[in-house]
Swiss-Prot record:
Entry-linked NCBIfam families: PRK02624.1 (NF002728)
Subcellular compartments: Plastid, Chloroplast thylakoid membrane
Function in brief: One of the components of the core complex of photosystem II (PSII), required for its stability and/or assembly. PSII is a light-driven water:plastoquinone oxidoreductase that uses light energy to abstract electrons from H(2)O, generating O(2) and a proton gradient subsequently used for ATP formation. It consists of a core antenna complex that captures photons, and an electron transfer chain that converts photonic excitation into a charge separation.
Protein name: Photosystem II reaction center protein H
Source species of the chain: Spirogyra maxima (Green alga)
Gene: psbH
Membrane-crossing residue ranges in chain numbering: 41-61
GO cellular component, one term: chloroplast thylakoid membrane
PTM (free text): Phosphorylation is a light-dependent reaction catalyzed by a membrane-bound kinase; phosphorylation occurs on Thr residue(s) in the N-terminus of the protein.
Length: 78
């Protein structure tokens, strides 16, 4: 057998620390999942809007989008 499970290690309760006591309330909702989709759709909408924003910024940076009346060169800024 390549691996062996040590039952003594699995049954020990672990070490109690002050950091663990502080972080315990954050883990109190473990395993509780709200039914339904929740805010998943809203998250998807914001992800799509952010992706569109990144594409627009990338196209402006690459100068593949030429805006009418707005020069894209650094020389025009001086």
């Amino acid at each position: 057998m390549a691996t062996k499970i040590n039952d003594d290690i699995l049954s020990t309760p672990g070490k109690k620390t002050s950091v663990g006591d502080i972080l315990k309330p954050l883990n109190s909702e473990y395993g509780k999942v709200a039914p339904g989709w929740g805010t998943t759709v809203l998250m998807g909408v914001f992800m799509a809007l952010f992706a569109v924003f990144l594409v627009i910024i990338l196209e402006i940076y690459n100068a593949s989008v030429l805006l009418d009346g707005i020069p894209v060169s650094w020389n025009s800024l001086s």
